[in-house]
């Protein structure tokens, strides 16, 4: 049996970020993952500006190595397609200047990101990184946990569970059952040779009437590839009996804005499905000697479906909470509340606003009316750009009176 201060379960973005942050303060850890790396991971492959921001905060040198090794494509905005085929190009940052502004976003295969982060951990952790290692059971003791794995037992004073949407960590309290409204289902595949991609690599979100409050996406990738997919809330999928793969194929074949662009494109492999645990304030993410991070903590953005940026942030915050625990020699429930409070302070407002936006998308007629009024409105692109940099502006967009004034050009 090996002993350590922190056992991190899961070597995805949340787990590896936690490991790298712990290492900066010389906190001993072991990190385990059931997979070998590099591994395929179902994802949209789009990374918001949160990703370079938090990696730079951890280490500017790591961000430089990421750009050098993974060669991510810089993405500068979003092309929204609303019901009625109204198209709006919205830059992440208006009048972007590379010398003044940070990288607004990336697209890169998740397989490459995860492998890079694991390599960074391997360089500092060596044999403390245990891949192809399955957690069999976890037993809570007075001074921590005994984790029984396929590679032997680990004794740890704390656990950070970053094992994803399929997390089986049994916390010592009853978890609420996952709600269909707090879960999204998604299908994605890869294509080569899709025509008409934006020259500044805008990602494309199609809010089509028959799939609201979900969307169809086209995300450009390096080497002439594109990540194509569709994501819809689980309760809507169940109620309407939606076959996601079939709907995705129907859009590619028949949508007038999409179909011509795929005429000479080649699909690479079969579609793959995944489950996205959306932000849920009822979900408890910390307690005596443990924390949940990333998808295990239900931190996927309810509007955009982004999970990687929030996973990295939560891994960073979990590590700093663990550092505080060892500095103060406190691991009790009351002390661990600080982790959830910091997560809510950093991510909670954004999650709440995204949830309310997603609720608005349930009403196709209203969305279509807004899109029609917004078409050609010179104020809309700038206003929507501000959504990505200013949460107060995003909150304003939930005010019907404010929306009406903008749409009426007042």
Regions from the language model: what does each represent?
Residues 12-13, 37-38, 112:
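Residue-level detector of alpha-helix initiation sites
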Residues 120-261:
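Predominantly flavin-linked oxidoreductase catalytic cores and closely associated redox partners
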Residues 323-410:
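C-terminal helical "tail/cap" subdomain of flavin- and related membrane-associated enzymes
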């Amino acid at each position: 049996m090996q002993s350590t201060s922190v056992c991190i379960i899961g070597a995805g973005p949340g787990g590896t970020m936690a490991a790298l942050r712990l290492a900066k303060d010389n906190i001993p850890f072991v990190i385990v993952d059931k997979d070998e790396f590099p591994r395929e991971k179902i994802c949209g492959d789009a990374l918001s500006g949160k990703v370079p921001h938090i990696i730079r905060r951890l280490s500017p040198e790591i961000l430089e190595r990421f750009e050098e090794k993974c060669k991510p494509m810089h993405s500068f905005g979003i092309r929204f397609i609303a019901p009625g085929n109204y198209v709006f190009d919205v830059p992440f940052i208006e009048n972007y200047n590379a010398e003044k502004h940070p990288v607004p976003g990336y697209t890169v295969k998740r397989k490459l990101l995860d492998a890079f982060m694991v390599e960074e951990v391997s360089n500092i952790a060596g044999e403390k990184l245990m891949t192809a290692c399955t957690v069999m059971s976890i037993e809570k003791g007075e001074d921590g946990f005994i984790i029984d794995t396929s590679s032997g037992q680990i004794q740890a004073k704390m656990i950070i569970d970053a094992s994803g949407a399929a997390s089986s960590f049994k916390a010592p309290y009853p978890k609420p059952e996952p709600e269909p409204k707090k879960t999204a289902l998604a299908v994605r595949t890869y294509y080569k040779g899709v025509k008409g991609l934006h020259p500044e690599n805008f990602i494309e979100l199609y809010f089509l009437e028959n799939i609201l409050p979900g969307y169809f996406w086209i995300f450009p990738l390096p080497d002439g590839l594109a990540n194509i997919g569709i994501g819809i809330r689980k309760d809507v999928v169940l109620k309407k009996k939606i076959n996601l793969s079939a709907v995705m194929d129907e859009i590619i074949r028949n949508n007038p804005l999409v179909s011509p662009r795929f005429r000479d494109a080649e699909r690479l492999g079969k579609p793959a499905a995944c489950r996205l645990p959306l932000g849920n304030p009822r979900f408890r993410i910390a307690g005596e000697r443990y924390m949940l991070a990333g998808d295990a903590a239900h931190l996927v953005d309810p509007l955009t479906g982004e999970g990687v940026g929030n996973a990295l942030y939560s891994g960073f915050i979990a590590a700093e909470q663990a550092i505080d625990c060892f500095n103060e020699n406190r691991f009790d429930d009351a002390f661990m509340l600080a982790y959830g409070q910091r997560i809510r302070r950093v991510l909670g407002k954004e999650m709440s606003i995204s949830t309310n936006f997603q609720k608005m998308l349930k009403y196709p007629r209203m969305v279509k009316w807004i899109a029609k009024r917004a078409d050609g409105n010179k104020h809309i692109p700038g206003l929507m750009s501000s959504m990505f940099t200013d949460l107060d502006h995003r909150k304003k967009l939930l005010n019907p009176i404010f929306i009406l004034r903008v749409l009426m050009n007042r």
